[in-house]
Amino acid sequence: MSFASNATGFRIPLTTCVYPSPILRFNAKVGSGSSYGTTEAQRNMKCVDGIGRSRVVAVAASGRTRDSNPEVESEKMKEMIRWMFRDMDDGEVSVSAYDTAWVALVEDIGGSGGPQFPTSLDWISDNQLDDGSWGDRKFVLYDRILNTLACVVALTTWKLHPHKCEKGLKFIRENIEKLDNEDEELMLVGFEVALPSLIDLAKKLGIEISDDSPCIKNIYAKRDSKLKEIPMDLLHKEPTSLLFSLEGMEGLDWEKLLTLRSEGSFLSSPSSTAYALQHTKDELCLDYLLKPVNKFNGGVPSTYPVDMFEHLWAVDRLQRLGISRYFQVEIGECLDYTFRYWTNEGISWARYTNIKDSDDTSMGFRLLRLHGYDISIDAFKAFEKGGEFWCMAGQMGHAVTGVYNLYRASQLMFPQEHILLDARNFSANFLHHKRLTNAIVDKWIISKDLPAEVGYALDVPFYASLPRLEARFFLEQYGGDDDVWIGKTLYRMLYVNSNTYLELAKLDYKHCQSVHQLEWKSMQKWYTDCNLGEFGLSEISLLLAYYIAASTAFEPEKSGERLPWATTIILVETIASQQLSNEQKREFVNEFENGSTINNRNGGRYKPRSRLVDVLINAITLVAQGRGISQQLSNAWQKWLKTWEGGGHQGEAEARLLIHTLHLSSGLDESSFSHPKYQQLLEVTSKVCHQLRLFQNRKVYDAQGCTSRLVTGTTFQTEAGMQELVKLVFPKTSDDMTSATKQSFFNIARSFYYTAYCHEGAIDSHIDKVLFEKIV
């Protein structure tokens, strides 16, 4: 383990400094945000990604603040995020020019002959880009061609803005042949059906769009093939994903279809619902469309509402970025909202959508179970068919992100939850294959680094994922407001993908890292002053012990837990590594017992003959300082020493010692130790840690540097033990202990799992990354 340097050339400081104190306090200091760029269509702050927004919301979406004082900026960003969560309703999502065009095509159902939604035509007029196209600021030709043709058709239908139409047509004619060169992974949902429908509409209006090129002929062929596969009888009988893309389809029985709408919409699709309104003049369809038209100043998103999607993914981003602790109230409200609409069939992207999908269900299940909600696994049964798990009925293929979220959810299984075991096996195999074939590209999102996200999940599973390690990697993987989603058109979720989240997370991480680096220097000073190197303890082991503690109890105010955790690991390793006879071990234990008894009685006048015993007693005294727990800590150490002397299960004894040390250090009353739940947690955790310590001595690694599977008999027991621990830790019960106390058991087990699971080289790189690499 090359701990002295990292990939960037930074050398870990080896100079001495203050003795490690179990109580170090630092004020939170965080830094500034970044600026936000708008497209030409958004000039003069008319809108942000097509949404009419106030300056406050625009800043909140972008992460830009004006103050240079880091602490003030940090608080402003936290307040922005709280405001964003309070503002969550049916979803802050960018406007789709394509869907807006279909809405604009609707003729007044009152019979005036004019447009039903004139403000939608205004939106189209106001949002043409300088090159003549309409669409997202990220240039994807599928998106620009579809949006532009739809807007030209809408404006031409109402004989408006011929110069804008001509400019749009010029863009289409110059670029449509280039579709042949586009990456098919970026093709929009239903593009091969939507584009021919628009071309046919354009022809009826006298708009000439060449359809005899090989490129367009190929798209028409795909359209014809897909339409032949659509079971028209099924389309009219029950809700399916086909309802999302009705626009342009012919031969529909609207009387039957209207029975399948939910809250006035067809699968929350404005364009599909607008097409239905054109043909039926249905009042419920009209009422549905008025909501987004009014909210977004004439424009409409490609999907609306997206409330479940927004609530869940926003919480997930805060958690993975390591800043969720600042927003516990807001997160609780989001999850209460989700739980209110949970069903045994799962959930969807919107609360009233009448078909469910495994992607939103997986994310909802994972977050609800993590936060103690009583949540059923029955929903996953609806998505399993023939050994595979599908996002929704009728799906033609698997999306990487959907399977990725299924994989993450499956890792929170309780014992005997076989459907989640099946889901984990399927999703893990699918994702491993995608990685091996370099095919981690998703059909739902264009994100900064999806392969790295999936890679981390495979290499460092939930049981091994230390909180600070996950945050450090996700800071590099999360694209903020540059991430864009793929639907019928490209779209953005302003409260899911936000530079405000990213900037606050970076600044928070930098502050935590600076605290950890100061503590690491003090640990080195303590190591030198105690001459621990003479007892065979290397600085590598010292660093690993501190890293494990700092990556778990990472918050600056938790130095009173980090330092006792690290020193306990270090002293256990140092003592256990001594080559002592049985008699020498007995003398060591006796001397500790005598020394700690005298010290506890008369204030520390006893000087033991063994320097290592002296180091141990002094460490206990420092941890106990000002807390009145010296005797309790000594008792905990005596139990571990007795196990060490007798050659008992070291991993189990170490876990018990570590748990008691952390709980005493954090102020937990010793009376809690006799709580039945505490005893149960202690028993399961200590056994799991013992099994992991045994496994650590005979693990086999794969090419990625982590064990590809836990394969020994002991390890199968470990997996069962971890499942039992998850069941004990995360659910909330009426006679329960605090969630923080229960979580600490899982944290200890996770630290053992991490060191057993990951290769030394991987751990080495993690240490450099978490503690020493600078955040850019």
Swiss-Prot record:
Involved in diterpenoid biosynthesis. Catalyzes the conversion of all-trans-geranylgeranyl diphosphate to ent-8alpha-hydroxylabd-13-en-15-yl diphosphate. GO terms for cellular component: chloroplast. Its main location: plastid. GO terms for biological process: gibberellin biosynthetic process. Mg(2+) binds at D357, D359. It catalyses: ent-8alpha-hydroxylabd-13-en-15-yl diphosphate = (2E,6E,10E)-geranylgeranyl diphosphate + H2O. Keywords: Chloroplast, Lyase, Magnesium, Metal-binding, Plastid, Transit peptide. GO terms for molecular function: magnesium ion binding; terpene synthase activity. Its EC number is 4.2.1.173. It is found in: Plastid, Chloroplast. A motif (DXDD motif) lies at residues 357-360. Substrate binds at K226, K443. Pfam families: Terpene_synth (PF01397). The Asp-Xaa-Asp-Asp (DXDD) motif is important for the catalytic activity, presumably through binding to Mg(2+). Its cofactor is Mg(2+). This is Ent-8-alpha-hydroxylabd-13-en-15-yl diphosphate synthase CPS4, chloroplastic. It comes from Salvia miltiorrhiza. Belongs to the terpene synthase family. Pathway: Secondary metabolite biosynthesis; terpenoid biosynthesis.
